[in-house]
A protein has these predicted regions:
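Short, charged juxtamembrane terminal tails flanking transmembrane helices
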Residues: 217-225
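A detector for small-residue-rich transmembrane helices and their helix-helix packing motifs
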Residues: 1-215
Length: 225
């Protein structure tokens, strides 16, 4: 029980720390009257290269940040809880992959916010659970579909608002899907359903042999007397 509670708490450390940084930067931006938008991705221009690494840390408004907070925490917590041994690699790959793809396919302008990370995490958790065919992970896939299935519409220019970076959303989804495939052989795996059955015959044969030897020894002693 204590180990479960500890694991739950540890899985929340990095998500909470990241969210703390996001709010700290937003309050600094507002309080000091700074403009962090130039830390975002500007596609296919040199000034936008740094944004590949920094764009998830910047949000256009407090409302934008508030909208991203809960899904970012929940999805990243799921990643670090269920995939704890490979979570850091996946999170980093989605972060950089989302920024790099946005840099390549985005429309001119500054692309900011952690929405791409959210899409990346959602698509990773969904496809990873399906590909691994492991019941707890499939349950997470279904839960993600139930909670965030509507996100898919904001990946396309036909449904997204003009001010929404649908390219960032699509980039995150692609990065998450690629990670689900690339890391499929790592981390939690479906247990082998035949593992116990393969061991049972050996154990049973050992027990039968033991009983046979005991009976044989008894008969020898009787003849000797």
């Amino acid at each position: 029980m204590k180990q479960d509670v500890r694991r739950i708490a540890l899985a929340a450390v990095i998500p909470l720390f990241l969210i703390f940084i996001l709010y700290l930067l937003k309050f600094l931006e507002v309080g000091m009257d700074w403009d962090f938008r130039r830390l975002g991705v500007y596609p296919m221009e040199q000034r936008g290269v740094f944004g590949i690494f920094a764009h998830p840390l910047v949000h256009g408004s407090l409302r934008h940040l508030l909208a991203n907070t809960l899904p970012l925490f929940f999805l990243s917590w799921c990643l670090f809880y269920f995939y704890r041994h490979i979570a850091s690699y996946i999170f980093f790959a989605i972060w950089i992959g989302c920024g790099a793809l946005t840099f390549l396919i985005g429309k001119p302008g500054w692309h900011i916010g952690a929405s791409g990370i959210i899409y990346g995490l959602a698509f990773f958790l969904f496809f990873s659970g399906i590909l691994r065919k492991h019941v707890p992970l499939i349950a997470i896939s279904l839960l993600v579909t139930f909670l965030y299935g509507g996100l898919i519409w904001n990946m396309f220019p036909f449904f997204a608002k003009e001010t929404t970076s649908w390219e960032g959303h699509l980039s995150g989804a692609i990065a998450g899907t690629i990670c689900a495939i690339a890391f499929m052989e790592y981390g939690p795996q479906r247990p082998d359903p035949f593992a116990d059955e393969e061991e049972t015959p050996d154990e049973e044969s050992g027990e039968e042999g033991k009983e046979y030897e005991e009976e044989e020894n008894t008969e020898v002693k009787a003849d000797y007397n």
